[in-house]
């Protein structure tokens, strides 16, 4: 299950705002043990004040979902990671996360991410695959 999660190229990060409304965004990520990291990178954003960061600061419980769809339904699967997130602005934890993300996504070599890191400590894994029942 974790290996499928780790190999995925994009996850959906679900957070909850102070108003109780869910917020879902696609993110690049890396998995290291029970920690999932993502970074606010240089891709264009509508605003510098990202809702996901405000939501995490207000309510740190998050979910990350990766999945595979195929018209051959025997290839379908999904993995969900539930955990507690924190926003890491500076320091060794941020630097280590960016290095791990750069190893997975070479695009970051040309455009080094300058934003904060979202670090999720996973406390629950759930998944399903057609061939595994």
Predicted regions and their residues:
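Charged, gly/pro-rich active-site loop segments
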Residues: 47, 72-133
